[in-house]
Amino acid sequence: MEDAEVAVVALGSTAGTARAAVDNMRSAGIKAGSVKVRVYRPFPAKEVFATLGNGRVKAVAVLDRSDALNNHAGPLCMDVTTALYQAGAHVPPSIALPHILNYIYGLGGRDIKPADIEKVFEDLHQVVQGQAASQPPTPPGMPLYENPMYLGVRE
């Protein structure tokens, strides 16, 4: 994470898959990183902000394994967003908070593959380059799209 411009946040074994994707993206020239949340409660908000709210990380994808039906993002994304927003209220304006994208994966017990996470990194890289897709970006530190995007779901 030392020089990462784009990062993914994941729980459990998905973090190992993300690490493999990070290695592939770094060999392709993209400054990628990953954050593994080891303990969910109490949520490590200070550590998340110290890692992602440093001004170097420009875009973050939060990988949730469950959907939140009454929220605009998954539970992990909501906690990461809250950690960045609350701590970000106390930082100088010169430090920009990253854009946040939320991805839901693993519905129906489907596995996530390194290629899926590499696609997420490509999306993040496009956001950093200012080429975000279909929906307009929201302010930094808030989820980038109104609804989460889904990985590995059959249509």
Name each model-derived stretch:
Residues 12-20, 43-47, 55, 71, ...:
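Conserved active-site and cofactor/substrate-binding residues in soluble primary-metabolism enzymes
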Residues 24-33, 55, 87-96:
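Secondary-structure transition/capping motifs at alpha-helix termini
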Residues 48-70:
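A structural-propensity feature for long, helix-poor, extended segments
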